[in-house]
From Swiss-Prot:
The NET domain could serve as an interface to localize different proteins or complexes to chromatin. Residues 345-358 have a biased composition (Low complexity). This is Transcription factor GTE1. PANTHER family: OSJNBA0053K19.4 PROTEIN. It is found in: Nucleus. Its main location: nucleus. Disruption phenotype: Impaired cotyledon greening during germination. Seeds are deficient in the phytochrome A (phyA)-mediated very-low-fluence response of germination. Mature plants appear normal. It comes from the Eukaryota. The keyword Transcription applies. The gene is GTE1. Residues 66-106, 340-386 are annotated as: Disordered.
Amino acid sequence: MSVHVKEEPVLVPNCDVENTELAVFNGNGESELENFGTCVDEITDRVNQLEQKVVEVEHFYSTKDGAAQTNTSKSNSGGKKIAISQPNNSKGNSAGKEKSKGKHVSSPDLMRQFATMFRQIAQHKWAWPFLEPVDVKGLGLHDYYKVIEKPMDLGTIKKKMESSEYSNVREIYADVRLVFKNAMRYNEEKEDVYVMAESLLEKFEEKWLLIMPKLVEEEKKQVDEEAEKHANKQLTMEAAQAEMARDLSNELYEIDLQLEKLRESVVQRCRKLSTQEKKGLSAALGRLSPEDLSKALKMVSESNPSFPAGAPEVELDIDVQTDVTLWRLKVFVQEALKAANKSSGGTNAQNNNNTGTGEINKNNAKRRREISDAINKASIKRAKKA
């Protein structure tokens, strides 16, 4: 059945929701249309702002969950471990950098204990070759820098300790070992310097073992403190994000209420559909695609919860629907049919070449006919009443 849908005049609402006068404007309500448009624009701007906040909240929880999964996988792979970073001595002035990276900072007591140990090694009778930088030029050691990548001596270490360039004892330990390892690398085992370096390194390692328990205890304590600090910071962030999420939820709910109020105001200011328009709407519903028809029936069920929108067969009585529902259906049907007319040619050609899709279309067409028949029956009943 071919139905000509009459083009309707412009419907102009007033954003003042208290004004419930019903009216239809044939292009003469520009000011009220502008007023309504301003209301919608303001709500749209607010929704866009809230959308950005929603993205922030979603990003926070997505990254939080990802980090939690990563930590869980790490903990499941083995027992609890405490990572102790090796010192990086590539640059002399490293104290500030080490601290900024959150590495262990030895206590003053531990630093004093290590200084005593260092002084004992430096004052040993065999320590004299290692107290100053190697005189490469004076001794004619032309290949020294080819063999030794990073020269180090006890005198340089002492100066760095006095100027607080070390942040923890592990850094000093690494440099002291480097002094003796360099000597053992460059000199042959039979030479005196090699023997002296090997002996002092052994004594140094023995003394180092004496302070290890306290060092490990300090490092563990610092790791625990950092973990607690991080956990507290995370809890604070989560609380802030949770509060933001609640505020967003409340604001979005308020916007929904405003939109619903505006929609009701629009419909109240619009005239009622005529009998002829209702007949046209009934016929147009039967021409919708199954997907669009389901959407239309869902609109009916939103204002009438008892309406069985998902049932195999439905009987839709246009006369009992609210003005809000009728206008929503009218606008939706017009837009849906326009879109369907634009794409019907290509869609039909594709469906004819696909057997499986053709079978689905047959079933869909059957459902459209059933619903259309039900709507037409309702129209006949209404005509008889008239």
